[in-house]
């Protein structure tokens, strides 16, 4: 197969950053994505409706002329988030979800939730108004090995939330383990997951064997090949529970290539192209459209996009860097080829 036409896809998890960087991140993701769930972990984070809506306006101001790209906003949950704030956010019409960052789990998560029981009244309000609950599913206990933090979170925390709030729609984001695949598969239809392109294409050997490659360092961290294969199986299974979320997370080159580098991989420059490679690797290009264009909007109760994009099997070389505000970002596959491109 050398050409594929699919319904315009959406990205159900992205970091666009803010300030001078917005112009570059929005340019990249709006090339062919119809919508994107925009993460709220700014500095300071988008912890209330007013802040999230102001961020929406800043993003929209950077959408290139002629693009119909629409950002979907997310509230950043803290120990102090109130049920009333959830109702305000829902009423805004622009904020479609609220996000759990366990305090300290990832970039700019220090304001996050210290104990999930602190937000139980908020989860009840979300269940009542129909707001989605997005979860960074890792524990932050320093005694837990970094490769086990997703599994332990599912066993100790997420399983209880799912049981206590059966009507709450939950997205376990950027899953990285067979444990997560199995949990989501066996859970009710109210539980779904996003999967990144880099977790489908790479495992921890790519990051650590033969030298440390910091641009593969992200959270949750890349796992064993057996987990990578489980993710590929889930994405290509045709299950409606799994959909596209790039978790594209830009950091300046010098912040990644450092003694203590930041977590995050940049894929917005070639998101659907990288997913096409992943699906082709398991002979499942016929399943790409549902994963990229149908399952996400269906789970969010939003209309599917009505137009299409066409992918062509034509190799191209990725630049060594892309502009990122007043600095540069090194993208995934920098200086190497990608097999597919959007026509």
Swiss-Prot record:
Pathway(s) it belongs to: Pyrimidine metabolism; UMP biosynthesis via de novo pathway; (S)-dihydroorotate from bicarbonate: step 3/3
Co-factor remark: Binds 2 Zn(2+) ions per subunit.
Ligand binding (Zn(2+) 2): 99, 136, 174
Positions annotated to bind substrate: 15-17, 41, 136, 219, 251, 263
GO molecular function: dihydroorotase activity; zinc ion binding
Amino acids binding Zn(2+) 1: 13, 15, 99, 247
One BP annotation, GO: 'de novo' UMP biosynthetic process
Pfam hit, one: Amidohydro_1
Organism: Shewanella sp. (strain W3-18-1)
Name this protein carries in UniProt: Dihydroorotase
Enzyme class: hydrolase
Active-site residue numbers: 247
Recorded catalytic activity of this chain's protein: (S)-dihydroorotate + H2O = N-carbamoyl-L-aspartate + H(+)
Annotated keywords: Hydrolase, Metal-binding, Pyrimidine biosynthesis, Zinc
UniProt function note: Catalyzes the reversible cyclization of carbamoyl aspartate to dihydroorotate.
């Amino acid at each position: 197969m050398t050409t594929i036409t699919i319904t315009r896809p959406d990205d159900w998890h992205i970091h666009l950053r803010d300030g001078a960087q917005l112009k570059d991140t929005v340019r990249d993701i709006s090339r062919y994505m119809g919508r994107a769930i925009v993460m709220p972990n700014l500095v300071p984070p988008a912890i209330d409706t007013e802040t999230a809506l102001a961020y929406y306006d800043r993003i929209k101001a950077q959408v290139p002329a002629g693009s119909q790209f629409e950002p979907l906003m997310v509230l950043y949950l803290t120990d102090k988030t109130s049920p009333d704030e959830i109702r305000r956010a829902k009423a805004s019409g622009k904020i479609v979800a609220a996000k759990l960052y366990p305090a300290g789990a990832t970039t700019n998560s220090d304001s996050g939730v210290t104990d999930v029981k602190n937000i139980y009244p908020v989860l009840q309000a979300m269940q009542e108004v129909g707001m989605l609950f997005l979860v960074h599913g890792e524990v932050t206990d320093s005694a837990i090995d970094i490769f086990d933090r997703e599994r332990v979170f599912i066993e100790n925390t997420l399983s209880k939330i799912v049981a206590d709030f059966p009507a709450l729609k939950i997205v376990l984001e950027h899953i990285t383990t067979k444990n997560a695949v199995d949990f989501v598969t066996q859970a009710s239809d109210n539980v779904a997951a996003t999967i990144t392109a880099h977790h489908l294409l790479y495992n921890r050997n790519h990051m650590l064997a033969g030298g440390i490659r910091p641009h593969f360092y992200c959270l949750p961290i890349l796992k064993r090949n057996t987990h990578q294969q489980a993710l590929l199986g889930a994405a290509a299974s045709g299950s409606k529970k799994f959909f596209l979320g790039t978790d594209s997370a830009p950091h300046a080159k010098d912040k990644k290539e450092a003694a203590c580098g930041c977590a995050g991989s940049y894929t917005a420059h070639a998101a659907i192209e990288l997913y096409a490679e992943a699906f082709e690797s398991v002979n499942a290009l016929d399943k790409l459209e549902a994963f990229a264009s149908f399952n996400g909007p269906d789970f969010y109760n939003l209309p599917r996009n009505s137009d299409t994009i066409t992918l062509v099997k034509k190799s191209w070389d990725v630049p060594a860097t892309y502009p990122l505000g007043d600095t540069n970002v090194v993208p995934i596959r920098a200086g190497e080829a990608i097999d597919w491109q959007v026509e």
